[in-house]
Amino acid sequence: MPELPEVEVSRLGVSPHLIGNTITRVVVRERRMRWPIPQEVAKVEGQKVTAVKRRAKYLLIETAQGTLILHLGMSGKLRVIDASTPVIKHDHVDIVLSTGKCLRFNDPRRFGAVLYQAPDTHIPMLDNLGPEPLTDDFDDTRLFTLSRNRKGPVKNFIMDNAIVVGVGNIYANEALFLAGIDPRRAAGNISAARYKSLTATIKQVLAKAIEQGGTTLKDFAQTDGKPGYFAQHLNVYGRKGEPCEACGKAIESKVIGQRNTFFCTRCQR
């Protein structure tokens, strides 16, 4: 599943091809996505793209006549290609540009979304979202304060989009390892000092992932559909039974909040 770094890398990759150019057509081949694609997406046709933003895992393609809201879901990916490129299976939407290019949205599982929001109106799905993790709005004081009296596992707590957006499963595992915190520990039983460390490691792993993803930006202009996700060194995620690189003890795995969780019982307390 694309997580925040992958979506941010997508934004960085497609932005130069969109901003300042005009959307000539929005071609919808399949409307049955996570939510039905509305007819109103056509309202951006003939409009110049003024900005491409990200909020949580939503991409916002802004024009004077409204905003297209994209979500990659479980399996979605974006390609900037020649508009004449033959369609392949699961190519559900094209945002065709005046340059002869198009932004093509491919989504095999159809859990993604393409929605329209009129100018100066409220975007309901962005309600109740916490701060972006790489901004100053996300700090250890907020995290510690909101954690008080929370009995659930700290991993679930930091993955709650009302607390902070975009800390998906991979990066929650990695941040907790670097902070030395057991993901099973109750969020309310962690000290302010340890939340300071955890806030720093969340920012660290997300920033590093985005930086590493920057080397794949060339993929967004290719026709082979490479998603632009990036291989990176992971300390615990997906490494059940392998030795911890810090202490040598075998990495353990447990399902927490319906997600596989990986940790070292020696390094994480």
Curated annotation (Swiss-Prot):
Cofactor: Zn(2+)
Catalytic residue list: P2 (schiff-base intermediate with dna), E3 (proton donor), K57 (proton donor), R259 (proton donor)
Binding positions for DNA per the UniProt entry: H90, R109, R150
Zn finger residue spans: FPG-type: 235-269
Presence of the UniProt keyword Glycosyltransferase in the record: no
GO biological process: base-excision repair
Keyword DNA-binding among record annotations: yes
Pfam families per the UniProt record, alphabetical: Fapy_DNA_glyco (PF01149), H2TH (PF06831), zf-FPG_IleRS (PF06827)
Alphabetical list of InterPro entries matching this protein: DNA_glyclase/AP_lyase_DNA-bd (IPR015886), DNA_glyclase_Znf_dom_DNA_BS (IPR015887), Formamido-pyr_DNA_Glyclase (IPR020629), FPG_cat (IPR012319), MutM-like_N-ter (IPR035937), Ribosomal_uS13-like_H2TH (IPR010979), Znf_DNA_glyclase/AP_lyase (IPR000214), Znf_FPG/IleRS (IPR010663)
Transmembrane segment boundaries: none
Domain of life: Bacteria
SMART domains hit by this protein: Fapy_DNA_glyco, H2TH
Keywords, ordered alphabetically: DNA damage, DNA repair, DNA-binding, Glycosidase, Hydrolase, Lyase, Metal-binding, Multifunctional enzyme, Zinc, Zinc-finger
Catalysed conversion reaction: Hydrolysis of DNA containing ring-opened 7-methylguanine residues, releasing 2,6-diamino-4-hydroxy-5-(N-methyl)formamidopyrimidine; 2'-deoxyribonucleotide-(2'-deoxyribose 5'-phosphate)-2'-deoxyribonucleotide-DNA = a 3'-end 2'-deoxyribonucleotide-(2,3-dehydro-2,3-deoxyribose 5'-phosphate)-DNA + a 5'-end 5'-phospho-2'-deoxyribonucleoside-DNA + H(+)
EC number: 3.2.2.23, 4.2.99.18
Cofactor note: Binds 1 zinc ion per subunit.
Family statement: Belongs to the FPG family.
Subunit structure: Monomer.
Described purpose of this protein according to its UniProt entry: Involved in base excision repair of DNA damaged by oxidation or by mutagenic agents. Acts as a DNA glycosylase that recognizes and removes damaged bases. Has a preference for oxidized purines, such as 7,8-dihydro-8-oxoguanine (8-oxoG). Has AP (apurinic/apyrimidinic) lyase activity and introduces nicks in the DNA strand. Cleaves the DNA backbone by beta-delta elimination to generate a single-strand break at the site of the removed base with both 3'- and 5'-phosphates.
PANTHER family linked to this entry: FORMAMIDOPYRIMIDINE-DNA GLYCOSYLASE (PTHR22993:SF9)
Protein name: Formamidopyrimidine-DNA glycosylase
Source organism per UniProt: Alteromonas mediterranea (strain DSM 17117 / CIP 110805 / LMG 28347 / Deep ecotype)
